[in-house]
Structure formats: structure tokens, C-alpha cells
Amino acid sequence: MAVALTEYRIETDGKFFRRNGQRVWLRTVTYGPFPPGKPASRTTEFARIRETGFDSIRIFTLPDRALLDDAERAGLTVFAGLNWDHYGDFLKKPVRLSAANVRLDAWLREHATHPALTGIYVGNEISSDLVRWMGPAPVREAIESLIELGRNIAPHLLFAYANYPSTEYLEPANADFSAFNIYLEDRDAFTAYLRRLQNIAGDRPLVVSEFGMDSLRNSLETQAETLGWARQTAHQEETAGFTVFSWSDLWARGTSEITDWDFGITDRDGNEKPACNTLRKFASSPSTHNAKFTVIVCTRNGSERITACLRALGRMTGNPFDTIVVDDGSEDGTAALVDAEFPDIRLISIPPSGLSAARNIGADAATAEILAFTDDDCEPDREWLIRLEKAFQDPDVAAAGGPNLPPPARTPAEAVIRSAPGAPSHVLLDDTSAEHLPGCNIAVRRAVFQAIGGFDSVFRTAGDDVDFCWRLSDAGHRLAFVPGAFVWHWRRPSLRAFLRQQLGYGKAEKFLLTKHPVRFGKNGEARWTGFVYGGGAIRAEDDSVIYHGPMGQAGYQSIVNRMLPLRPIDSAFRNPWTNFLLALVRILQPAARRWARNRRIRFGFTKPAAAESPSPVREFGIAGTDGWSRDHCLSILLHAGWQASGNTDPWDLEKGGTRVLVAAENLGGGLTNCLFRVWGSHAAAIALEHELRAAQSPDESLPN
């Protein structure tokens, strides 16, 4: 019986996905590409996939309508793949990228409205050496251009790029979710890397777009066990979905069947492996902890905001909790509104006393073991407390919090403000520990709160959370970061209100500087030990320093100067005017804070650094077959006395002042074109080319 998919589609929901208003966790399996004529019956295969517990398939091509129809009948959604020629330098030969644009455009115009289609992967694992060759920023911009094209045609679909650890810095800014192909067979390493990727993903959902194990080199039982714990771990670590690679051992590159690996959970004859039964039994782990929470919301003149906040709390799932609203001398009827519309919520009205005092009064009235604070302009996610509760299962955790995400912009001003610096942000010491958690999303053990004296009432409108977290850290307590425990936090509605807020933050920083002078620099800016969260996915820019490893061969390559980027302007509002406004705000925001803090204005202009690297003197390519590869070329040069690069050098080898970068293009049919970029003298570059052409034979004897 067909399952209707026409009424709703999958959408992003903060760090997760939802369908028809309900949170969904994607359970996906890759399907194909297959040798010609196989499998025999797609209809039967799709029914088996659904019965095994998957709700979606990922394919590596743009499918025909028949496949989409079969998926719809089976109750499966489809993530299609734009398979284009990114196996060579598509910047030097832009026809490759142009062809991808034309193909995506034509396919979407024909198939974008199909009810089974959920999303598009616009690329998959562009080779790290080619990314290094073309430059991370231009490659990322090319990926972003494909996403932009697709979104303009089909804004209802999800768009992403399937990344992998060797280019984790290549995250497109405009993707709907971050996707990583991960093959880590150690559970602890897999867990740690997912936690890292949550912060690389920024505000958006994280999906494991491939995870698999070869049962040819491992036992069937080991494959089943590994896939079982990997999917369970991905769920526990708050990803938005998990993709098993792959459904079948049948696999082809072009028309050639691949027989030297068995990643499928069914064999080449269609028989189930033990992994199918393991995956069929998957269930989320229930919480074994029953911590009691009191949620404290402080408000002043919040009548236009607090209803949405309290209704969001009313939709909260999990164990019962108490809610206390502290009305800090409102003059707009806030207290009467809360009393009339939310009679089950405890309301405490006080004369105007300031935010810190209001929070302390709420804490004094609470009886639960954990105090959770949020603001009247926030709407906590329905799973907020459940996810915070898991953090407190660790007895060493004194406080915990998650991201505060801006809701989608409704106006151009909101679009600019949600992309501007200066919003309340968490600061991370590592992937799971925080130096600072904003007061709009922080929970703390009541005993610890009382032990350090709560919030300092000298801070009336802002800065109290910074002081509170620093005092927690100074007392030796751990602050945990929980990426899935998010609240929607409305930013200021206008640029005037936003800059007025920044002046208030600057005034608060005056008190912080007096109280914590060692935590500030000579110009009055806070000196954080960790990284300030900006909301955008971590991605390389033109001036980024990237750890590639010697000769660019590190399996995990990352940005060294990890300045966490801000969110991009929503594409619906991005135009020259909003780009100009954002550039202006990025100048005025720190200036406003500096004026309020120091009573002086100093705009943050810096003189661009002069380029240090000379231009290459020669580029050339040498094509070959039967073992001609980048690794082979590097071996030739190492044998000839060339020295390997350092971890962050933009070249691979050096000899006598001459440097060379090597990349490889896969031209198909077993043909590889090795690319060489040379710095130094023209004579040395020509000599290098002659040396390589002379040694081109892959049968050349090389030392071990």
C-alpha cells in the first residue's frame, strides 16, 4: 500500500528536521549505482528497504521519474545526487561547472515537485588535493553557486554538499544542513568526531551522509555490530540523521562492476546480512535520569513577547517541571497577561530591580535541583530540557546550555541583524566544554548556584551571565555544551534597537572589566580562552591557515586559525542594499560597544597584509595510466632528494629553493593527469618537468 507523501515535506527545525510539525530523525541507506541490469526488481528492493526500518534513500545520481514513483509507493523519500565532473580542475575548465549548472537546472525544472524528492547533494567528496590546488574558498564558492541555483528553482527542497574529514573546512555557507561521510570504526573516535562536527556545522543540522563497513575484510558479525553502535551513537550525539553505506554489495563505477569490497547490508544475490536485523531493531535510548527542573523566565515590559515563550514551554516534552515568571516592574500589563493566560505558572512581581536581581529571586523561589534560565524573547525547543538533562547525568557538570538560534528573518532588517556580530553567544573551550553560556539558555545545579552566590545584582540589563560563568569556572566547575538543546531567540527588530542593545552590552562590559580585569585586553575587549560561536558553519576563507599535514596527506584536515564565522544573510533578503547594511553594522557594532565601555570610538579597520607568497613560475600536467598517480609522483621526487612540506604549507615538496604542489585529475578510463605548480626559477621548473616525464613509467624501481 502506497504511503502518501504529498501533504508535507521534510524541513529544517533548528539543529534537526521536522515533517508535518513532528521531529524526524532520518534513517537513510545509499542505493546504487549498480551494474547494468541490476537489481532485477526495484519495487521489491524498495519494499525491503522500508521494512528494514529506513525512511529514505540516498542515490548518487539525478534519478528518472520512475525511480521517484517507486520510492513514493514504498513510502521512501529520496536524496538525489548531482554527479558532475569535479574530478578535475573545474576552475581552469569552467565548462565542467557550467555543465553541472545546466544539468541541475534542467532536472529540477522537471522533477523538483515530485512528492518523494526531499533533497539534493550538489557534490560528494571533492578530492582534498584538488581543493588545495584550486583553493578552498573558490571551490566552496562553486559549491555554493550550485546550491543557490537549486534553491532558486526549488526552495522547498533541502540542499547540501557531502563533505569528508580531509576537507572539513569546505563547508558551504548556504547549505541547509552539514553532511559528512565518516568511516571511523572505533566508537570513541566516532563519538569525539561527531562532537567536533556539531560545532563545525554551526546553527544547522548535522547528518552522517555515509557510514559503512566492508564485510569482505571484516566479519559479517563485526559489520552488524559496528553499524548498530554507529547509528545509536549518531542519535545520542544529536545528529539529524544517519546514512548506511550501502544497501547492496552490488556496486559499479560507470559500467564496471566493483567486486573487491562488500559494504552492502545485502549480498550480490540480494540475501540479507546480519546487519539488516541489527538495524531493524534500532530504537532510541530512553533517559534513565529524572532530574527535576525549574524554568525561570524574567521579564520587563514583555507583554508582546512572553506569550510565545510560555506557550513554547507548554509544549515541552519529558518529565514535569515548574515554571516561574519574575516580572521586574513591568508597566505594560505583562503581569496581568501572565496571570490571566497562564494560571498554572507561578508569577512573582517585584519593583524594578534589574535582570540579575530578578533571576536571583526566581532561583530563591525554586525548589528543583536544576535551575534553567531563559528570556521572554526566547522560545525553547520542545526537547530543550530533555537534552539538558542528559548533560547533568555527568556529576562533574555544574552547568549546561546550548545554542540560541535566531528564527528565520521576516524583514530585511532582521536578516541583517541575525548575520551581524554582537549577539549573545556561547564560547567553547573544546567541543563539549564551554567558557561562557548565555543567560537565555543556561541551566545550573541549584546547590552550585547557591554556593557561588547566584548572579551579581550590579548587572541590571546584561553582563550578568558572563560574570556568572567566569565565577563558575574560577571555582573549578565544568560548563557543558549541548548542541541539540537550543532555544529560538528573537533578535532586535530594527537596526536602531540593535545598536542600542550593543551600547547596553558595552556598559555592562565596564562593570565586567572592573570586576575581572585580567580577562580584558588593553583596549577593553574581553580576552576569551575559547572560541566565540558565530552561528555560521566553519569554513575556509582566502586568508585561512589550514592544517593539511606533510604533503597535504593528513586524513583529517582543519582550519588552524579557527575564527568562527557568522551566519550568512538569508538568500531571500540578500541584495546589494542588505550587503551594504551588514558591512556598515559590522563597523558600527564594535564601535558602539567601545564607546559605551571606554567613551572613545575606534573603528576596527585594519590595513590589509601584503601578500607574502610569490607567484608560481610554471604549471603543467602529465597524464598517464597503470599506476600513474599523485602518490607515485611524490615518491619519485622524494627519492630524488626533495623534502616534504610542513603541516600548513601551501606546497608539497621543496628542493634548493624550488617548491612544487601536486594534484591529480581523474580523467576516466584509467587515465590520471597529474598537475604540478612550481615556485622558484623558470629553469628549475623546466628541469623538474623533464625529470618527471623521464620517470613517468609506473614500473620505475623505487625504494620501499
Residue ranges and their predicted role:
Residues 11-14, 18-175:
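Active-site mouth of glycoside hydrolases
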Residues 245-292:
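Aromatic-rich peripheral "rim/lid" segments of glycoside hydrolase catalytic domains that contact
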Residues 311-320:
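Short, acidic, metal-binding catalytic loop of nucleotide-sugar glycosyltransferases
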Residues 312, 327-336, 378:
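A conserved acidic beta->alpha catalytic loop
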Residues 350-366, 428, 432, 440:
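Glycine-rich, basic loop-to-helix element that forms the pyrophosphate-binding segment
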Residues 371:
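Short aromatic/hydrophobic "clamp" motif used to bind/position activated sugar donors
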Residues 383-414, 478, 490:
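Conserved donor NDP-sugar-binding/catalytic core segment of glycosyltransferases
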Residues 402-403, 417-435, 450:
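Short, flexible, basic/aromatic active-site loop/helix in glycosyltransferases
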